[in-house]
Amino acid sequence: MVANGYGRTAWLVWGVGVFGYALAVMHRAALGVAGLEAAEHFGTTPGIISTFVVLQLATYALAQVPVGLLLDRYGSRLMLTGGTLVIAGGQALLATADDLSTAYVARVLLGIGDACMFNSVLRLLPRWFAPNRVPVLSQVTGMVGALGQIAAVGAVLPLIKLLGWQTGLLITVAFSVFAAVLVLAWVRDAPPGQAPAVVVDPIREIPRRIKGVSMHPATQLGFWVHFTSGFSSIAFVFMWGIPYLVVGQGLSQAEAGGLFALLSVASMVAGPVVGSLTARHPLRRSTLVL
């Protein structure tokens, strides 16, 4: 039971939000596991398919500031709903695309929708849970999101191989549409009786605020930690993944899928441990990073 008394409602709000986020991760990782099938469908090479992911991640990064401004203005509920529907639209376009240019547009849409998800879920935590639970739940949110990578191996790839590229992907799109309905029905930006936190900055103030945030030591530390520690796993999961293990290393698809899932399981185990240590020793976060 949470200390603030919101109990099951808080867990429901968070659970629905993190379900949508996990599906976003599943779609994000889909080409990392189905790169060979994508290359066959579009009549190209896995190297070209990896450029889809580069474009997607670049879009994801560039969308962070505008998405953050929209999140401040409209709240998590609308951003999660909109992000999930944009992801579904992008994946539906990818499923029905026959040429590379349309596929690139589809991945741009996925990057935009994906950018709406994680921060929107995190924004719910301090409104619904006691402060001492937020660090652990932030890690658990990322941990549950890693289930999306496992779902990409265990669901997306088998569906594509069994039913074909278009039908397999469209089935995964249906899950995201269902998630959007759940978010709209159950997620609320604040508990009953509390006004949602709305921040509306004048447009002219935005560059100054971005500069101020960018110059803050905590922001710079977080940036360089993610920059140096995350690139290898991101490159593997979202760009090379199973095609590299199958074609480059000669593993069977089952062996490659097992190794792919192992990376996600390892992060799921480590996440809550790091979150708990961060909550207990907030002034030792830099030591934990090192």
Label the model's feature ranges:
Residues M1-G7, A190-F223:
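Juxtamembrane intracellular "pre-TM" segments in multi-pass secondary transporters
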Residues A63-G75, A270-L283:
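Helix-to-loop junctions at the C-terminal end of transmembrane segments
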Residues T141-D189:
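Helix-loop-helix hairpin linking two adjacent transmembrane segments in secondary transporters
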Residues A29, L57-V65, Q149-I150, S264-P272:
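Residue-level signature of mid-helix packing/kink "hotspots" within the transmembrane helices
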Residues A106-G145:
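Cytoplasmic helix-loop-helix junction between adjacent transmembrane helices
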Residues G43, G75, T96-T102, A130, ...:
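Helix-breaking motifs and short loop linkers at transmembrane-helix boundaries and internal kinks
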Residues L62-L100:
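Conserved MFS/SLC helix-loop-helix module at the cytosolic interface between two early adjacent transmembrane helices
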Residues L31-G32, P217-A261, M268-G271:
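Extracytoplasmic gate region of multi-pass secondary transporters
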